[in-house]
Amino acid sequence: MSIGKIIQVIGAVIDVEFQYNDIPNLYHALEVNIDNGNSHQVLILEVVQQLGRSIVRCIAMGSTNGLKRGLDVTNLKHGIQVPVGKETLGRVMDVLGNPIDMKGPINSIEKWSIHRSAPLYEELSSNQELLITGIKVIDLMCPFIKGGKIGLFGGAGVGKTVNIMELIRNIAIEHAGYSVFVGVGERIREGNDFYHEMIHSGILDKVALVYGQMNEPPGNRLRVALTGLTIAEKFRDEGHDVLLFIDNIYRYTLAGTEVSALLGRVPSAVGYQSTLSEEMGMLQERIASTKSGSITSVQAIYVPADDLTDPSPTTTFAHLDATIVLSRQIAALGIYPAVDPLDSYSKQLDPCIVGQEHYDIANNVKSILQRYQELKDIIAILGMDELSEEDKLIVLRSRKIQRFLSQPFFVAEVFTGFSGSYVSLEDTIAGFKEIIDGKYDHLPEQSFYMVGSVKEAIEKSKIL
């Protein structure tokens, strides 16, 4: 057994000295027993640097309270390993795979290391099958494919977590798929609400939850995304189509910044770590679909100060197949989900993938909304009367389209007072086509607000 001694503690970074011929490898896990009189704690460290002179620098995967120089450290001779397989479904784990839901141990047959290689090029799948979410604005304007990577961009409080909760609910119930949810540096309250929402929806047994909340050390928040991804990779390799939800990628970046500063690395632009692109690439390249199964990833990405040019969101952009931008201006109008259809984009919005009709209707919706944006200044200064008849019609239809893009969510029923709605792709396309064609020009625009299909809008108009 390889034993070392702690020689320095700087916050979450610990230096350990070993015998010169027994130095741990990078990413090896080390174990420290901390005895504080009444309590006993086992702390796991991960080797991230070899400093020379038989000293390794580690990051702590837990609180360093009670650590002191001279404590013995055991080299476990392997990386951090977490339980994988169906035994993880319905359970809440921390970064080390330990259960934190007070339901007893996870009796998993297998444990996998959280540091793994991305699949080889010949193993990758090029399948282009659409994944229907039941959310109109997403299915029409920025469709997903199985095995795609989707980014939910938005500032504070515009609905990233609620959108993720609705996606998990819809896909678990309508598609009967497995999901892995990773909470990276988010609020404990949100994690608790999310857990109880999964119980309320009856889909907890189809979701594995991995939490590294914002009160935890940076090491936990940096590695928890890899823990969740490892669990998802196991499901994929067993032939399942699995969904991986990460909330929030920005906190993953921020944890990397904290660790980088503690390790003494020179910072890059805006204070981010100089290895930002590499760390992001190592995570994103593992989120891949193979010929065995698929991992479809939905990642919430906080945008600092609503600035999309910040290095953190821009580094993430390069890896995504679809970007869904949540707008504060649209949220201010009371339209939820607050997706901006003009800023959002999907590589899958292609006639070869979605079909010509879907492609044409999505483009028509975009052009009508874009024209409405251009006319807003004229309306504000001169009023509607100065517009041509054609422009008046565009404004009328665009306001209906804008409201029809809203939708009541199942997970938000208690807040909105509207019953949740899942809308098929066929109903979505048909509804927008009929609005564009002017079939519902006689209906009040308010009848299209917070409804599912266009049939619900017709029924609503009868009571307005």
Curated annotation (Swiss-Prot):
The keyword Transport applies. It catalyses: ATP + H2O + 4 H(+)(in) = ADP + phosphate + 5 H(+)(out). Its EC number is 7.1.2.2. Its main location: membrane. It is found in: Cell inner membrane. It is an enzyme of class 7 (translocase). Keywords: ATP synthesis, ATP-binding, Cell inner membrane, Cell membrane, CF(1), Hydrogen ion transport, Ion transport, Membrane, Nucleotide-binding, Translocase, Transport. One of its GO terms (molecular function) is ATP binding. Pfam families: ATP-synt_ab (PF00006), ATP-synt_ab_N (PF02874), ATP-synt_VA_C (PF22919). Gene3D superfamilies: 2.40.10.170, Bovine Mitochondrial F1-atpase, Atp Synthase Beta Chain, Chain D, domain 3 (1.10.1140.10), P-loop containing nucleotide triphosphate hydrolases (3.40.50.300). InterPro entries: AAA+_ATPase, ATP-synt_VA_C, ATP_synth_F1_bsu, ATPase_a/bsu_AS, ATPase_alpha/beta_chains, ATPase_F1/V1/A1_a/bsu_N, ATPase_F1/V1/A1_a/bsu_N_sf, ATPase_F1/V1/A1_a/bsu_nucl-bd. Produces ATP from ADP in the presence of a proton gradient across the membrane. The catalytic sites are hosted primarily by the beta subunits. Belongs to the ATPase alpha/beta chains family. F-type ATPases have 2 components, CF(1) - the catalytic core - and CF(0) - the membrane proton channel. CF(1) has five subunits: alpha(3), beta(3), gamma(1), delta(1), epsilon(1). CF(0) has three main subunits: a(1), b(2) and c(9-12). The alpha and beta chains form an alternating ring which encloses part of the gamma chain. CF(1) is attached to CF(0) by a central stalk formed by the gamma and epsilon chains, while a peripheral stalk is formed by the delta and b chains. This is ATP synthase subunit beta. It comes from Blochmanniella floridana.
